[in-house]
Amino acid sequence: MDFGHILKSLVGMAKSDIEKKVEQQQTMSDRIVVDAVEVVEPFDFPPVDPGSIITLEKPAHFRLKMKRFTQLGSGNKRWYDAIMDVRFDKGFKTNGTSAPKIFNLQVPAYIAMTEKNANIYNAAAFIHDGLYACKGEIEEEGVPNAKNSKRRYTLSRIECDNILSEIWRKSDFVDSLTAKIGELGVNLFAGGEEHWDNDDLHCKTSFSAKIKYLK
């Protein structure tokens, strides 16, 4: 398969066509928009070659201000404001493989920590890898219209992919169209059993995510 040709074809598609494909896929689906990314505790790892396994030498913590379109309780689907706290323990490992390799030239899995906004950009693939390894399982707090306001919940693959491209956009390292192309590539090429619920690097025990809904 000529992956280079596939990449060029996708990049060459009109912006409206890309947006239409993603919109069609997400129609009536739960989805997430990230408004801001706060670096609470930055990443700390030594320089590595592309494709190598990264091991965090210190804990890291990121906070996402977000909107989530979903159904909570017995109400209809609507947008909810929320904060998502994502924590990585020391020793968390990732190689960015939940994002397809054919897009690495256009949207690299991670960038050198010396680059501008590297923490935010790298958080995209790191969080995505963690969510995929956990099969989207997170904690929820402050759940409206629910008897128990705290619970375990599973994000859909589309929501996890939303988070990936939304953080890419917030990093300003790639433009909105390129981020959307990257998300489409994840939808098309990285969605099977090979990555979803794949914890080959044993990062489930060193990754956690919690969404807190705002009143």
Language model features: what each stretch is:
Residues 2-215:
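Extended terminal accessory/targeting regions
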